[in-house]
A protein has these predicted regions:
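Polytopic transmembrane helical bundles with strong interfacial aromatic enrichment
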Residues: 1-333
Protein backbone atom coordinates (compact mmCIF):
# COMPACT_ATOMS: atom_id res chain seq x y z
CA UNK A 1 0.00 0.00 0.00
CA UNK A 2 2.82 2.40 0.80
CA UNK A 3 4.37 1.89 -2.63
CA UNK A 4 0.98 2.30 -4.29
CA UNK A 5 0.51 5.57 -2.41
CA UNK A 6 3.85 6.81 -3.72
CA UNK A 7 2.91 5.88 -7.28
CA UNK A 8 -0.45 7.60 -6.97
CA UNK A 9 1.34 10.66 -5.61
CA UNK A 10 3.48 10.85 -8.74
CA UNK A 11 0.37 10.49 -10.92
CA UNK A 12 -1.36 13.19 -8.89
CA UNK A 13 1.39 15.70 -9.56
CA UNK A 14 1.39 14.77 -13.25
CA UNK A 15 -2.39 15.23 -13.43
CA UNK A 16 -2.20 18.65 -11.79
CA UNK A 17 0.65 19.55 -14.14
CA UNK A 18 -1.45 18.50 -17.15
CA UNK A 19 -4.36 20.53 -15.78
CA UNK A 20 -2.07 23.53 -15.38
CA UNK A 21 -0.95 23.24 -19.01
CA UNK A 22 -4.57 22.96 -20.16
CA UNK A 23 -5.60 25.96 -18.07
CA UNK A 24 -2.67 27.86 -19.58
CA UNK A 25 -3.86 26.93 -23.07
CA UNK A 26 -7.34 28.22 -22.26
CA UNK A 27 -5.74 31.35 -20.88
CA UNK A 28 -3.85 31.84 -24.15
CA UNK A 29 -7.01 31.37 -26.24
CA UNK A 30 -9.22 32.90 -23.55
CA UNK A 31 -11.01 35.43 -25.73
CA UNK A 32 -12.48 32.62 -27.79
CA UNK A 33 -14.07 30.80 -24.87
CA UNK A 34 -17.21 31.80 -23.00
CA UNK A 35 -15.21 32.22 -19.80
CA UNK A 36 -12.62 34.35 -21.57
CA UNK A 37 -15.23 36.58 -23.17
CA UNK A 38 -16.87 37.09 -19.78
CA UNK A 39 -13.54 38.13 -18.27
CA UNK A 40 -12.86 40.84 -20.85
CA UNK A 41 -16.43 41.92 -21.59
CA UNK A 42 -16.40 45.74 -21.77
CA UNK A 43 -18.32 47.69 -19.17
CA UNK A 44 -20.87 50.29 -20.24
CA UNK A 45 -21.50 53.48 -18.33
CA UNK A 46 -25.15 53.99 -17.44
CA UNK A 47 -26.69 57.40 -18.14
CA UNK A 48 -29.53 59.03 -16.28
CA UNK A 49 -32.95 60.00 -17.56
CA UNK A 50 -32.92 62.87 -19.99
CA UNK A 51 -29.34 62.22 -21.07
CA UNK A 52 -28.47 61.18 -24.62
CA UNK A 53 -29.50 57.64 -25.30
CA UNK A 54 -26.17 56.70 -26.88
CA UNK A 55 -23.90 54.65 -24.65
CA UNK A 56 -20.98 56.57 -23.21
CA UNK A 57 -17.64 54.91 -23.71
CA UNK A 58 -15.31 54.37 -20.79
CA UNK A 59 -11.70 53.20 -21.00
CA UNK A 60 -11.62 49.66 -22.25
CA UNK A 61 -14.93 49.90 -24.15
CA UNK A 62 -15.22 48.52 -27.62
CA UNK A 63 -16.60 50.86 -30.30
CA UNK A 64 -20.30 50.41 -31.09
CA UNK A 65 -20.82 47.95 -33.87
CA UNK A 66 -23.42 45.73 -35.37
CA UNK A 67 -24.24 42.86 -32.97
CA UNK A 68 -23.83 40.32 -35.72
CA UNK A 69 -20.38 41.60 -36.66
CA UNK A 70 -19.20 41.79 -33.02
CA UNK A 71 -20.17 38.21 -32.21
CA UNK A 72 -17.23 35.82 -31.91
CA UNK A 73 -16.62 33.77 -35.03
CA UNK A 74 -18.24 30.38 -34.97
CA UNK A 75 -15.70 27.71 -35.64
CA UNK A 76 -16.07 23.92 -35.60
CA UNK A 77 -13.65 23.81 -32.68
CA UNK A 78 -13.63 26.53 -30.04
CA UNK A 79 -10.11 25.99 -28.79
CA UNK A 80 -10.42 28.12 -25.67
CA UNK A 81 -13.57 26.39 -24.44
CA UNK A 82 -12.17 22.97 -25.32
CA UNK A 83 -8.96 23.52 -23.38
CA UNK A 84 -10.98 24.81 -20.43
CA UNK A 85 -13.16 21.70 -20.34
CA UNK A 86 -10.13 19.45 -20.63
CA UNK A 87 -8.45 21.35 -17.80
CA UNK A 88 -11.41 20.88 -15.48
CA UNK A 89 -11.65 17.19 -16.35
CA UNK A 90 -7.95 16.55 -15.76
CA UNK A 91 -8.14 18.63 -12.58
CA UNK A 92 -10.96 16.41 -11.32
CA UNK A 93 -8.88 13.33 -12.18
CA UNK A 94 -6.04 14.80 -10.15
CA UNK A 95 -8.37 15.23 -7.17
CA UNK A 96 -9.37 11.55 -7.37
CA UNK A 97 -5.74 10.45 -7.60
CA UNK A 98 -4.95 12.76 -4.70
CA UNK A 99 -7.67 11.11 -2.64
CA UNK A 100 -6.30 7.70 -3.56
CA UNK A 101 -2.85 8.79 -2.42
CA UNK A 102 -4.14 9.73 1.02
CA UNK A 103 -6.40 6.69 1.40
CA UNK A 104 -3.67 4.19 0.52
CA UNK A 105 -1.20 6.06 2.73
CA UNK A 106 -3.64 5.83 5.63
CA UNK A 107 -4.29 2.13 5.03
CA UNK A 108 -0.57 1.43 4.91
CA UNK A 109 -0.01 3.27 8.19
CA UNK A 110 -3.14 2.02 9.91
CA UNK A 111 -4.11 5.58 10.93
CA UNK A 112 -5.24 8.90 9.53
CA UNK A 113 -2.57 10.21 7.12
CA UNK A 114 -1.83 13.37 9.08
CA UNK A 115 1.12 12.30 11.20
CA UNK A 116 4.03 14.19 9.63
CA UNK A 117 4.86 17.18 7.46
CA UNK A 118 4.62 15.21 4.21
CA UNK A 119 1.15 13.90 4.99
CA UNK A 120 0.02 17.26 6.31
CA UNK A 121 0.97 19.05 3.08
CA UNK A 122 -0.77 16.40 0.97
CA UNK A 123 -3.91 16.77 3.09
CA UNK A 124 -3.89 20.57 2.91
CA UNK A 125 -3.46 20.60 -0.86
CA UNK A 126 -6.22 17.99 -1.18
CA UNK A 127 -8.62 20.23 0.72
CA UNK A 128 -7.54 23.15 -1.46
CA UNK A 129 -8.16 21.16 -4.64
CA UNK A 130 -11.60 19.99 -3.47
CA UNK A 131 -12.50 23.55 -2.48
CA UNK A 132 -11.42 24.71 -5.93
CA UNK A 133 -13.72 22.20 -7.61
CA UNK A 134 -16.59 23.43 -5.43
CA UNK A 135 -15.83 27.04 -6.41
CA UNK A 136 -15.74 26.02 -10.08
CA UNK A 137 -19.15 24.40 -9.74
CA UNK A 138 -20.67 27.50 -8.17
CA UNK A 139 -18.66 30.14 -10.06
CA UNK A 140 -17.63 28.80 -13.49
CA UNK A 141 -16.72 32.33 -14.58
CA UNK A 142 -13.55 32.25 -12.45
CA UNK A 143 -12.14 29.25 -14.30
CA UNK A 144 -9.11 31.24 -15.49
CA UNK A 145 -7.86 31.10 -11.90
CA UNK A 146 -7.31 27.39 -12.45
CA UNK A 147 -3.91 28.05 -13.99
CA UNK A 148 -2.67 29.60 -10.75
CA UNK A 149 -4.46 27.12 -8.48
CA UNK A 150 -2.90 24.20 -10.34
CA UNK A 151 0.50 25.90 -10.17
CA UNK A 152 0.21 26.08 -6.36
CA UNK A 153 -0.82 22.42 -6.18
CA UNK A 154 2.11 21.30 -8.33
CA UNK A 155 4.64 23.36 -6.38
CA UNK A 156 3.42 22.37 -2.91
CA UNK A 157 2.96 18.69 -3.69
CA UNK A 158 6.32 18.63 -5.41
CA UNK A 159 7.92 20.29 -2.39
CA UNK A 160 6.29 17.72 -0.12
CA UNK A 161 7.74 14.87 -2.16
CA UNK A 162 11.21 16.39 -2.53
CA UNK A 163 11.72 18.05 0.86
CA UNK A 164 9.35 16.49 3.37
CA UNK A 165 8.85 12.88 2.28
CA UNK A 166 8.70 10.51 5.25
CA UNK A 167 8.33 6.71 5.00
CA UNK A 168 5.12 5.26 6.38
CA UNK A 169 5.40 4.70 10.11
CA UNK A 170 3.46 4.81 13.38
CA UNK A 171 2.49 8.00 15.14
CA UNK A 172 4.83 9.43 17.73
CA UNK A 173 3.47 8.89 21.28
CA UNK A 174 2.41 12.52 21.72
CA UNK A 175 -0.09 12.17 18.87
CA UNK A 176 -2.00 9.22 20.36
CA UNK A 177 -5.07 11.19 21.40
CA UNK A 178 -8.58 11.85 20.17
CA UNK A 179 -7.51 15.50 20.01
CA UNK A 180 -5.31 14.46 17.10
CA UNK A 181 -8.40 14.03 14.92
CA UNK A 182 -10.08 17.21 16.17
CA UNK A 183 -7.14 19.60 16.18
CA UNK A 184 -5.32 18.47 13.06
CA UNK A 185 -8.43 17.99 10.90
CA UNK A 186 -9.68 21.54 11.52
CA UNK A 187 -6.24 23.00 10.87
CA UNK A 188 -5.98 21.03 7.62
CA UNK A 189 -9.39 22.17 6.38
CA UNK A 190 -8.75 25.80 7.31
CA UNK A 191 -5.27 25.77 5.79
CA UNK A 192 -6.52 24.27 2.52
CA UNK A 193 -9.19 26.93 2.13
CA UNK A 194 -6.75 29.70 3.06
CA UNK A 195 -4.37 28.29 0.44
CA UNK A 196 -7.09 28.59 -2.17
CA UNK A 197 -8.02 32.06 -0.91
CA UNK A 198 -4.50 33.31 -1.58
CA UNK A 199 -4.98 32.75 -5.33
CA UNK A 200 -7.88 35.16 -5.98
CA UNK A 201 -6.26 37.56 -3.50
CA UNK A 202 -3.10 37.68 -5.61
CA UNK A 203 -5.01 37.95 -8.86
CA UNK A 204 -7.21 40.71 -7.45
CA UNK A 205 -4.14 42.84 -6.83
CA UNK A 206 -2.83 42.04 -10.31
CA UNK A 207 -6.18 42.77 -11.98
CA UNK A 208 -6.53 46.02 -10.02
CA UNK A 209 -3.13 47.13 -11.27
CA UNK A 210 -4.09 46.20 -14.83
CA UNK A 211 -7.33 48.19 -14.55
CA UNK A 212 -5.26 51.18 -13.44
CA UNK A 213 -3.31 51.07 -16.69
CA UNK A 214 -0.23 49.14 -15.60
CA UNK A 215 0.95 47.11 -18.58
CA UNK A 216 4.12 45.48 -17.30
CA UNK A 217 4.53 42.02 -15.81
CA UNK A 218 2.87 40.71 -13.66
CA UNK A 219 -0.08 43.06 -14.22
CA UNK A 220 -0.50 41.82 -17.78
CA UNK A 221 -1.63 38.51 -16.26
CA UNK A 222 -4.78 40.29 -15.14
CA UNK A 223 -6.04 40.87 -18.67
CA UNK A 224 -8.07 37.67 -18.92
CA UNK A 225 -9.08 36.92 -15.36
CA UNK A 226 -12.41 37.87 -13.82
CA UNK A 227 -13.30 41.40 -12.79
CA UNK A 228 -11.44 42.75 -9.77
CA UNK A 229 -14.65 43.02 -7.74
CA UNK A 230 -15.44 39.34 -8.36
CA UNK A 231 -11.96 38.26 -7.29
CA UNK A 232 -12.03 40.40 -4.15
CA UNK A 233 -15.43 39.08 -3.14
CA UNK A 234 -14.29 35.48 -3.61
CA UNK A 235 -11.17 36.21 -1.55
CA UNK A 236 -13.26 37.52 1.32
CA UNK A 237 -15.73 34.64 1.31
CA UNK A 238 -13.01 32.00 1.40
CA UNK A 239 -11.20 33.72 4.26
CA UNK A 240 -14.41 34.37 6.18
CA UNK A 241 -15.26 30.66 5.93
CA UNK A 242 -11.80 29.44 6.96
CA UNK A 243 -11.10 31.85 9.81
CA UNK A 244 -13.52 30.36 12.40
CA UNK A 245 -12.16 26.88 11.65
CA UNK A 246 -8.60 28.10 12.08
CA UNK A 247 -9.58 29.85 15.31
CA UNK A 248 -11.07 26.67 16.74
CA UNK A 249 -8.20 24.45 15.64
CA UNK A 250 -5.32 26.72 16.63
CA UNK A 251 -6.61 28.59 19.67
CA UNK A 252 -9.16 26.21 21.21
CA UNK A 253 -8.53 22.57 20.28
CA UNK A 254 -4.75 23.02 20.20
CA UNK A 255 -4.41 24.45 23.73
CA UNK A 256 -6.84 21.86 25.12
CA UNK A 257 -4.74 19.08 23.60
CA UNK A 258 -1.56 20.73 24.91
CA UNK A 259 -2.99 20.79 28.43
CA UNK A 260 -3.95 17.12 28.21
CA UNK A 261 -0.55 16.09 26.82
CA UNK A 262 1.94 18.47 28.43
CA UNK A 263 0.07 19.93 31.39
CA UNK A 264 -0.17 23.49 30.08
CA UNK A 265 -2.39 25.29 27.60
CA UNK A 266 0.25 27.45 25.97
CA UNK A 267 4.03 27.19 26.02
CA UNK A 268 5.17 29.62 23.31
CA UNK A 269 6.50 26.76 21.21
CA UNK A 270 7.65 28.08 17.78
CA UNK A 271 4.66 26.56 16.00
CA UNK A 272 2.27 27.95 18.61
CA UNK A 273 3.82 31.38 18.21
CA UNK A 274 3.55 31.37 14.42
CA UNK A 275 0.01 29.98 14.53
CA UNK A 276 -0.94 32.88 16.78
CA UNK A 277 0.80 35.33 14.45
CA UNK A 278 -1.17 33.91 11.51
CA UNK A 279 -4.40 34.21 13.46
CA UNK A 280 -3.70 37.85 14.35
CA UNK A 281 -2.87 38.74 10.74
CA UNK A 282 -6.00 37.08 9.36
CA UNK A 283 -8.09 38.77 12.05
CA UNK A 284 -6.57 42.09 10.94
CA UNK A 285 -7.52 41.28 7.35
CA UNK A 286 -11.16 40.62 8.22
CA UNK A 287 -11.26 43.77 10.35
CA UNK A 288 -9.71 45.82 7.54
CA UNK A 289 -12.12 44.30 5.03
CA UNK A 290 -15.06 45.38 7.21
CA UNK A 291 -13.71 48.93 7.64
CA UNK A 292 -15.02 51.24 4.88
CA UNK A 293 -12.04 53.61 5.14
CA UNK A 294 -9.53 50.85 4.35
CA UNK A 295 -8.90 50.21 0.66
CA UNK A 296 -9.68 46.73 -0.57
CA UNK A 297 -6.17 46.44 -1.99
CA UNK A 298 -4.69 47.21 1.43
CA UNK A 299 -6.87 44.60 3.11
CA UNK A 300 -5.90 42.04 0.48
CA UNK A 301 -2.21 42.65 1.08
CA UNK A 302 -2.86 41.82 4.74
CA UNK A 303 -4.50 38.54 3.68
CA UNK A 304 -1.42 37.62 1.64
CA UNK A 305 0.79 38.47 4.61
CA UNK A 306 -1.27 35.99 6.59
CA UNK A 307 -0.62 33.32 3.99
CA UNK A 308 3.10 34.08 4.15
CA UNK A 309 3.04 33.46 7.90
CA UNK A 310 1.27 30.15 7.25
CA UNK A 311 4.06 29.10 4.89
CA UNK A 312 6.62 30.13 7.48
CA UNK A 313 4.86 28.01 10.07
CA UNK A 314 4.71 25.04 7.73
CA UNK A 315 8.20 25.06 6.23
CA UNK A 316 10.29 27.35 8.40
CA UNK A 317 9.26 26.02 11.79
CA UNK A 318 9.33 22.36 10.76
CA UNK A 319 12.67 22.52 8.98
CA UNK A 320 14.67 25.12 10.89
CA UNK A 321 13.29 25.30 14.43
CA UNK A 322 13.19 22.78 17.25
CA UNK A 323 10.21 22.42 19.52
CA UNK A 324 7.45 20.15 20.71
CA UNK A 325 5.80 20.22 17.28
CA UNK A 326 9.00 19.47 15.34
CA UNK A 327 9.21 15.83 16.32
CA UNK A 328 11.79 14.76 13.76
CA UNK A 329 12.65 17.62 11.42
CA UNK A 330 10.56 17.10 8.26
CA UNK A 331 8.88 14.15 9.89
CA UNK A 332 7.19 16.29 12.48
CA UNK A 333 4.20 18.56 12.25
Amino acid sequence: MAELSNQLMALTVLAYLAAMVSYAAEYAFGNRSRVGRAAVRPARQLVGAGAPTDAVEVPGDLPPSDPASSAPPRTPLDRGALFGKVAVGVNALGVLLHLGTLVTRGLAAGRMPWGNMYEFILSVTFVGSVAWMVVLTRRPGVRHLGLFVALCLVVLNGAAALVAYTPVGPLVPALHSYWFLIHVSTIIIASGILLLGAVPATMFLIRSGYDQGKRRFPYTLGKRVSAAETLERLTFRLHAFAFPLFTFGALIAGPLWAEASWGRYWGWDPKEVWAFISWVVYACYLHARATPSVKRTTATWIALLGFATMLMNLFGVNLFFTGLHSYANAGGM
